[in-house]
UniProtKB/Swiss-Prot annotation:
Function: Catalyzes the reversible conversion of aspartate and 2-oxoglutarate to glutamate and oxaloacetate. Can also transaminate prephenate in the presence of glutamate.
Organism: Rickettsia typhi (strain ATCC VR-144 / Wilmington)
Gene it is expressed from: aatA
Subcellular location field: Cytoplasm
Keyword entries, A-Z: Aminotransferase, Cytoplasm, Pyridoxal phosphate, Transferase
Assembly behavior: Homodimer.
Species classification: Bacteria, Pseudomonadati, Pseudomonadota, Alphaproteobacteria, Rickettsiales
Site entry (Important for prephenate aminotransferase activity), positions: 12
Protein's recorded name: Probable aspartate/prephenate aminotransferase
Matches recorded under PANTHER family: ASPARTATE AMINOTRANSFERASE
Residues bearing PTM N6-(pyridoxal phosphate)lysine: 239
Length: 399
């Protein structure tokens, strides 16, 4: 009898973290690799947030807290939802967890039974399907390629709904594409969902504050307050405040769901880090002056990367509304032969080719459910980004 559970047979380690690990190994070996695989901002956590954390340590705020988050932080989250999204939540409709990933994991563990279906638009953040599967649910994939601007249409949504559908996932702006749903698109989705009262919606808003040009962010509970009891909104401090390592995410939904998720959390991690919670209060309540400049900085990087990569004859690029990724269509390159005689047959092969030939680490599209694409993160310096994109272009020109 194996010591490893059969539950893990269909679960894969995070492919993005695998790319990061391989990149670090090559760098350690002295290879001049430019890493465009990581999904985290390249600026540091702001000083005012760090200072609150340091003070919290010195003041001895180092003990257990409420499992679902300290009331002061939940109040800051409640105020954030009202201030920025015009949504009213009570404190017992909010949970704080060890990152947005744990919020989502708790959500599915608390709500899914065997055979319950979760509609996942493709491409997707790599962890959605595996978290659904670990919770005994069934992922239902809906292709939303570049021809649909990487967004779910109401026609595709209706075709995917069955009497077993329990959740629909909406991620806007999206990882890996940066595509964002505008107000009208969300209204159309809400209109469709009103016909299906068995379907709940998880809105993953983690990239809310990284948007570009004239795109205006909306979240579904703001657009459709009548569906609020069926909507679970996920957010956190990782992206907007560059606090990926602090591990604070939060979610808001019905009291019954929050209570069930708190039970799950009480038997796994218990409370999130006490010091990180105090830092998150400062992130939400303190100055927001750096958020817009940081988004503008990412916009410049997006434009730089696009200006180089869209000139590659093999590529088709989508101009993202937010986040810090490009999800580039590259299937025209499939079937070509490298100088060493290898055939590039899929996105894994192409990513390996870029790593070997261009010394640039990217994530293959198959990791996000769509072969024929690759993802770059432009959360790096302008100099490194420009050099990496030039290397990619040159590597493609030699094929």
């Amino acid at each position: 009898m194996s010591i490893i559970s059969t539950r893990l047979n269909s679960i894969k380690p995070s492919p993005t973290l695998a790319v990061v690990k391989k990149t670090l190994e090559l760098k350690k070996a002295g290879v001049n690799i430019i890493a465009l695989g990581a999904g985290e901002p390249d600026f540091d956590t702001p000083d005012n947030i760090k200072e609150v954390a340091i003070t919290s340590i010195k003041d001895g705020f180092t003990k257990y807290t409420n499992v679902d988050g300290i009331p002061l932080l939940k109040q800051a989250i409640k105020n954030k939802f009202k201030r920025e999204n015009n949504i009213d939540y009570e404190l017992d409709e909010i949970i704080v967890s060890t990152g947005g990933k744990q919020v989502i994991y708790n959500l599915f563990m608390a709500s899914l039974d065997k055979g319950d279906e979760v509609i996942i638009p493709v491409p997707y953040w790599v962890s959605y399907p595996d978290m659904v599967a670990l919770s005994t649910g069934t992922p239902i994939f809906v292709n939303c390629g570049i021809e649909n601007n990487f967004k779910l249409t109401v026609e595709a949504l209706e075709r995917s709904i069955t009497d077993k559908t329990k959740w629909l996932i909406i991620n806007s702006p999206s990882n890996p594409t940066g595509a964002g749903y505008n107000c009208k698109e969300l209204e159309n989705i809400a209109k469709t969902l009103r016909k299906y009262p068995n379907v709940n919606i998880m809105s993953d808003d983690i990239y809310e504050h990284i948007t570009f040009d004239d795109f205006k962010f909306y979240t579904l509970a703001q657009i459709a307050p009548d569906l609020k009891e069926r909507i679970f909104t996920v957010n956190g401090v990782s992206k907007a405040y560059s606090m990926t390592g602090w591990r604070i995410g939060y979610g808001a939904g019905s009291k019954a769901l929050i209570k069930a998720m708190t039970v799950i959390q009480s038997q796994s991690t218990s409370n999130p880090c006490s010091i990180s919670q105090m830092a998150a209060i400062e992130a939400l309540n303190g100055t927001q002056d750096y958020i817009k400049p940081n988004a503008l900085n990412f916009q410049k990087k997006r434009d730089l990367a696009l200006s180089i990569l869209e000139k590659v004859i093999y590529f088709e690029c989508y101009k993202p509304e937010g986040a810090f990724y490009l999800f580039v269509k590259c299937d025209k390159i499939f079937g070509t032969k490298t100088k060493s005689g290898k055939i590039i047959a899929n996105s894994n092969h192409f990513s390996e080719y870029l790593l070997e030939e261009a010394k640039v680490a990217v994530v293959p599209g198959v990791a996000f459910g769509l072969d024929g694409y690759f993802r770059i993160s432009y959360a790096t310096s302008m100099q490194e980004l420009k050099e990496a994109c030039i290397r990619i272009k040159q590597a493609c020109n030699t094929l």
